[in-house]
Amino acid sequence: MTMTDTTQQDKKHTYNFNKLQKRLRRNVGNAIADFNMIEEGDKVMVCLSGGKDSYTLLDILLNLRLNAPIHFEIVAVNLDQKQPGFPEHILPEYLQSIGVDYKIVEENTYGIVKEKIPEGKTTCSLCSRLRRGILYRTATELGATKIALGHHRDDMLETLFLNMFYGGKLKSMPPKLISDDGKQIVIRPLAYCKEKDIEKYAQAKHFPIIPCNLCGSQPNLQRQVVKEMLQKWDRQYPGRIETMFSAIQNIVPSHLCDTHLFNFKDLQRGQILENIEGDIAFDKPEFIATSPIDDDDEQQDFHQVELINVKEIH
């Protein structure tokens, strides 16, 4: 390969990376606007696990803050769960290198989970509850007004199917929620972002990823089964994931079976109901989004290239 070829290839990689970054910025910005996730004067506590999703969340929020029409603070928080072999130095070194306020919370949730959960059983449920309580407490201590989590579009769809298959509910992850005691607001700014985009972005940025030895590496999890099912659908039927996500944004209560959402009992002959679709059970295919948008860089490799960011953060 000649020097000219190398230069052209580098330019192409850089162009595609910048395009990927802009798409993530746009998706996060749209989610923030659609659900009023961040407001003037907010102090946003970004929960940083050391995985690709939370790194990307922090990076994009820092980028967006530079040109945001409102002022808000960001503080990164990591929960050190005292897992054996956990590289405690990685996150502090990274956060110091980019100049972000941060707090490392040390709690031996690993020991609690191992004590309470029999060997071979899934630890996710207990681990999640313990983490949630600690993060809520930490947000109060820091004076944070919003807690930002790194769940993305694929996580939301996986949760939808998990609840349908195993819980008997049509329920997903909300992009924004209020805690049971009403004291905390949790936001998911990556709600519109695809996991494939996040993975490519994290690889391109060379984030120092820390694997989870509690839950992420456990085999045969129900979530992993659902994830593989969705990935297979995505390969076989391009656009299906986009259509499914569109579906949870377009709910028609009159065409489901939940009597709490729609008053079926009082329907009478001759009634004319506004904004009710009547006997139309299946929308015409041409009205359903069937293909992803702006994905012509889908197969690009951004690993070994000098990057030019839209906004470089130091």
UniProtKB/Swiss-Prot annotation:
It is an enzyme of class 2 (transferase). One of its GO terms (biological process) is tRNA thio-modification. Gene3D superfamilies: HUPs (3.40.50.620). GO terms for cellular component: cytoplasm. The thiolation reaction likely consists of two steps: a first activation step by ATP to form an adenylated intermediate of the target base of tRNA, and a second nucleophilic substitution step of the sulfur (S) atom supplied by the hydrosulfide attached to the Fe-S cluster. Belongs to the TtcA family. Catalyzes the ATP-dependent 2-thiolation of cytidine in position 32 of tRNA, to form 2-thiocytidine (s(2)C32). The sulfur atoms are provided by the cysteine/cysteine desulfurase (IscS) system. This is tRNA-cytidine(32) 2-sulfurtransferase. The lineage of its organism: Bacteria, Pseudomonadati, Pseudomonadota, Gammaproteobacteria, Pasteurellales.
